[in-house]
Amino acid sequence: MVKVGINGFGRIGRIVLRNALQFQDIEVVAVNDPFIDLEYMAYMFKYDSVHGRFKGTVEVKNGSFVVDGRPMKVFAERDPAAIPWGSVGADYVVESTGVFTTIDKASAHLKGGAKKVVISAPSADAPMYVCGVNLDKYNPKDTIISNASCTTNCLATLAKVIHDNFGIVEGLMTTVHATTATQKTVDGPSHKDWRGGRGVGNNIIPSSTGAAKAVGKVIPSLNGKLTGLSMRVPTQDVSVVDLVVRLEKPASYEQIKEVMRKAAEGEYKGIIAYTDEDVVSTDFISDNNSCVFDAKAGIQLSPNFVKLIAWYDNEWGYSRRVCNLLQYVAKEDAKAGI
């Protein structure tokens, strides 16, 4: 049993918990969030505008947050070092505030008794892992690791399959990305990113993303070969990667589709899915996969130049991978006697 604490009960924190409840070998024993009280925490978990009402029971009992009869201790500490994870047996912490994303900052959780921290965001210095891509490189001695970003999880899995089969010379990625909590409902100040301060409801907003470059960290042979940008659009959830690549080996689009279909049915099942139906973004709300290859949406200019399209639920699918990463590292840590 993997005993987990969640720091930060925002979009990812809550959806990680929803996913964790579906796994028999994960037990969330505590949640820390200094900005919401216990009653409001229960309300926010029970009702969700995107993923719907939670189908189980949600209660507040004796100072605990109780979901489906499972009690979780609730803390309200601003300083991660002050959270007593050890008192509730939380060996693993999901750091989902979006604030403590470096090794130095996330290490504060270890002072409270946690043994390992999984950052649910890209990190400037912590090792990043993408399920289906580079878990074999995991070192149990690392106490702080990152699950990378939702976009990197989609792009890296797609790029790995294509690169392994045809070779990628170079590529450009655009993610058409749903709104996130850091954006503004109406125009407001955003000193580092002026366009990012514009209202989300009536704009398509160009933005930077490190997702493509991060692929080079999890797939070293692609380092320096991919870059990209983001277009923030006024939808609540589900994003789509548009990857344009130049291939080393010439291939027909039918060959590419077949490779992706086999990947989805075989080694990457549960991480990559394949569709040849006339789908749109809402069809992928609460989808468990990191990457859903859209066979009908891609196009090809020549045997070495192709545009590939892949969908991902940037909330749900990503949170699912956080849980899968927890499962994997717990097993590897146990083997290593950690």
Curated annotation (Swiss-Prot):
Residues binding D-glyceraldehyde 3-phosphate: 149-151, 180, 209-210, 232
PROSITE patterns in the record: GAPDH (PS00071)
Binding partners and assembly: Homotetramer.
UniProt catalytic activity: D-glyceraldehyde 3-phosphate + phosphate + NAD(+) = (2R)-3-phospho-glyceroyl phosphate + NADH + H(+)
One Pfam family of this chain: Gp_dh_N
Gene Ontology biological process: glucose metabolic process; glycolytic process
Signal peptide (UniProt feature, chain positions): none
GO cellular component: cytosol
Molecular-function annotations in GO: glyceraldehyde-3-phosphate dehydrogenase (NAD+) (phosphorylating) activity; NAD binding; NADP binding
Keyword terms: Cytoplasm, Glycolysis, NAD, Oxidoreductase
Enzyme Commission code: 1.2.1.12
Active-site positions on this chain: 150
Site (Activates thiol group during catalysis): 177
Subcellular location: Cytoplasm
Keyword presence, Cytoplasm: yes
Name of encoding gene: gpd2
InterPro entries attached to this UniProt entry: GlycerAld/Erythrose_P_DH (IPR020831), GlycerAld_3-P_DH_AS (IPR020830), GlycerAld_3-P_DH_cat (IPR020829), GlycerAld_3-P_DH_NAD(P)-bd (IPR020828), Glyceraldehyde-3-P_DH_1 (IPR006424), NAD(P)-bd_dom_sf (IPR036291)
NCBIfam families (UniProt xref): GAPDH-I
Ligand binding (NAD(+)): 11-12, 33, 78, 314
Family: Belongs to the glyceraldehyde-3-phosphate dehydrogenase family.
CDD domains: GAPDH_I_C (cd18126), GAPDH_I_N (cd05214)
Highest taxon above the source species: Eukaryota
Major enzyme class: oxidoreductase
Protein name per UniProt: Glyceraldehyde-3-phosphate dehydrogenase 2
Pathway: Carbohydrate degradation; glycolysis; pyruvate from D-glyceraldehyde 3-phosphate: step 1/5
